[in-house]
């Protein structure tokens, strides 16, 4: 993770009582049981914004929600609607299937919005293809789910891409990380 991004997270988290940073995982591809895959969440005015989604991301978010003993209603997993991916390394992406499927099972009705580099859209397509029998079962089975909450609206991050809403402004930059292009994000 780009240190500049982490420092900006801390600046944002201290700028307002209504903005908080949750460090969900700082792990590497190595299976350390004490560290989940790379993932951070900024909660701005009770709207969650997820950055990278390594292994265990949904369980870590759920731990902060009242359903699982936490204090942040906004972090019920079905409330995750925005996810940003900096680059396609396994320690940043292995939680993608869980991010798509579990919040939908828990009641998310709106499609998840993912902003990521080239290749991330194909990852989503392959996950949906792999889980299609389960999705069909959940839509048409004995306990039907909605037919929209597992969908994803994907936007490819390009240099100087800007996402902005009433709570947050995010800009994508370009750099090389271990010989791979990456999109560090400033907030």
Predicted regions: what they are:
Residues 176-187:
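Single conserved hydrophobic/aromatic residue that forms the stacking wall/gate
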Residues 117-175:
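Metallo-beta-lactamase
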Residues 35-37, 109, 149:
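Extracytoplasmic
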Residues 21-23, 111-115, 123-126:
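Non-globular, low-confidence helical/coil segments that flank catalytic cores
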Residues 1-8:
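Sec-dependent signal peptide recognition
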Residues 45-48, 55-115:
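Active-site metal-binding motif and surrounding structural segment of the metallo-beta-lactamase
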Residues 10-50, 57, 161-173:
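Zn-dependent metallo-beta-lactamase
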Residues 30-32, 106, 179:
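Short glycine/serine/proline-enriched coil/turn segments at secondary-structure junctions
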